[in-house]
Structures are given as C-alpha cells and as structure tokens.
C-alpha cells in the first residue's frame, strides 16, 4: 500500500468490491477485521458496530478476531512443538510473507505454516452459515472488510493454499461512512455478535499477535523499513538467545495503519489498548468448535523462493535479455 499512500497524483487504486457487487449471493456474512473497531469514537459496545453491519445489508457477521483467537491457540502449540525452527515468523501479514519469498529465501523454513485469521474466520463462518441456512456453499458470500490492499492481493493470489475461502472484499474506508449512518439505529437494539476477546481484537495492533502467543520470548516490529532491518538481522542470525516468535507488520502501528482505514493509526492503536479493559481475555477455544481439525487451518501448499531479481533461468538466458 506504500505506492497508494505516497503517490502525489493519487493515481494508484486498490482492486476491491463494493456493496452493490454482493447481490449475486443469496446470503452474505461480513468478516470485520479487528482494525475496524478502532475507526469509530465512543463505541464501547462492539455489538453496536456489528449490528450496524446487519443494518447495512449483511445477513450475518463473524468476527475475524474470533478466527485470530483460533490461530493464536494453534500458533502456541506449533511454536512449542517445533523448537528446532525458532524463531518462527508470523504469516499474518501477506506483505511480509511475499517479501521473505523474494528477498530472504533463507528464512522461508521459519515461516509459521498457518492460515491467516481472515481465512480461519471464513472457514468457520461458512460452516455456520451452511448449518444455519441449509444453502449450498456457493450461494453464501463471505465478505472481508479489509484495512489494506495486501490482504486483498492475498485473497486473489493466496500463499500456502490453493484458493481463498473469501468471496469478496470491501475496503474499510468504503464501508465506514455507510456504517456511521446506521450507528444510532444499531445503538437502540444491539444484537449480540461478539465472539472474541482481547487476544483476538489485539491482532489489530503491533504486538497484539505476540500477546496472544503468551510468551516473553518474542520480537515485534512494524513499518516496512523497520521490518526489512529485522529480517536482515535474522538472516545474519543476529537475534536474542531463546527468541521463539517474530511478529512483523508492514504498516506502522500494525493493521490499524493500513491504507484502507480512516483513523490516524496511532490514535487507533490507543483506542484498541483502551478497549482492552472492557474485554474478556478470550472467547474462542479450539476444543469448543464442532468437528475441529487443526489441519484445516494449516498450509496445504509449500511457500517457495520466487526469484524476481533474475532475468532468466541461467546466465546465458539472462544475457540474451539484456
């Protein structure tokens, strides 16, 4: 999203869907990113915001932060079971994953082979919608509300899996004014949709994912320049003894700093931290999910090196292209 953020002529745009594009589905489920909550002022009851999504036109809502709590639990297990791969690197930010593929291939074995929270939430949301409605899966639209173009790119060109479980993507900045106009009505009769606590909602900010790992042996960095410096040091094996987990976010302050959000990222980060005092620690547990299988949330395809800096497969082919 840096090119969108810095282009002086505003010539760059994001490939995304709009509310009018969702008419092709018989039933739609909104997947609000954890960063959505911090875009609004004085909303202490998240159910007001989630109810507003149903007033906008969605049939149901499933929090991505609920998927994040499942991924946090699976991450803790994987980190504890694979000390030989420490430090493991988060794969929640698609920009980081792609950066490692093209520039730091030696770190690929350290990538945490888990689906990102939005995909985990999409799997769970679709199962619930099928059970609730009896509709075929292709009649149900799973719609992600995204804070950044990187996650949109992941949905169209996923890594670690063949096809995304998400059918459409709306930008938070597009849905924001529509939601704002429905907040007063939602406040009158909020419906309970909340499925997550601090651990899930904390993924919106830098350090939030590491908070869910429940370990002191982690490193968290945000901002693409800082991330590159950390990756260079990791490649040179310059890291703290006992380091288990590395959380990296391309956007400053974390996902709240995405180019498709509306609030100042540091104000949004402060809002997330303030909201923690009103939240339980955790809502979702793997053991509570019917027919839960950890392998459903693991990579199904390997992520491999992508040499974008070479002209050809060998030196002769490269010379011909010069």
Predicted regions span which residues?
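Iron-sulfur-associated redox domains of electron-transfer enzymes in respiratory
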Residues: 15-322
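Long, contiguous juxta-domain segments that are non-catalytic but functionally important
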Residues: 1-13, 17
């Amino acid at each position: 999203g840096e090119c969108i953020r810095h282009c002086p002529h505003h010539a760059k745009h994001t490939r995304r869907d709009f509310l009018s594009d969702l008419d092709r589905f018989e039933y739609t489920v909104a997947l609000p990113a954890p960063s959505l909550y911090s875009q609004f002022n004085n909303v202490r009851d998240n159910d007001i915001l989630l109810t507003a999504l149903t007033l906008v036109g969605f049939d149901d809502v499933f929090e991505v932060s609920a998927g994040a709590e499942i991924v946090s639990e699976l991450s803790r297990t994987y980190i504890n079971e694979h000390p030989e791969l420490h430090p493991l690197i988060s794969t929640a930010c698609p920009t980081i994953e792609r950066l490692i593929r093209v520039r730091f291939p030696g770190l690929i074995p350290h990538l945490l082979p888990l689906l990102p929270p939005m995909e985990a939430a999409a799997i769970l949301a679709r199962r619930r919608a099928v059970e609730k409605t009896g509709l075929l899966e292709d009649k149900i639209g799973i719609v992600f509300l995204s804070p950044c173009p990187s996650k949109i790119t992941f949905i169209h060109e996923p890594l670690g899996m063949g096809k995304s479980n998400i059918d459409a993507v709306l930008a938070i900045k597009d849905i924001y004014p529509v939601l704002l106009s429905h907040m007063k009505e939602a406040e009158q009769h909020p419906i309970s949709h909340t499925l997550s606590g601090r651990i899930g909602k904390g993924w919106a900010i830098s350090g939030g994912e590491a908070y869910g790992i429940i370990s002191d042996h982690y490193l968290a960095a945000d901002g693409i320049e800082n991330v590159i410096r950390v990756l260079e040091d990791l490649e040179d094996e310059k890291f703290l003894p006992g380091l288990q987990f590395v959380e990296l976010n391309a956007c400053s302050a974390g996902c709240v700093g995405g180019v498709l959000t509306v609030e100042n990222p540091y104000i949004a980060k402060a809002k997330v931290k303030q909201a923690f005092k009103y939240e339980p620690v955790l809502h979702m547990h793997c053991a509570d999910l019917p027919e839960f299988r950890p392998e459903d949330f693991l990579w199904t395809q390997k992520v491999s090196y992508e040499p974008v800096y070479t002209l050809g497969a060998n030196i002769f082919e490269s010379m011909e292209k010069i």
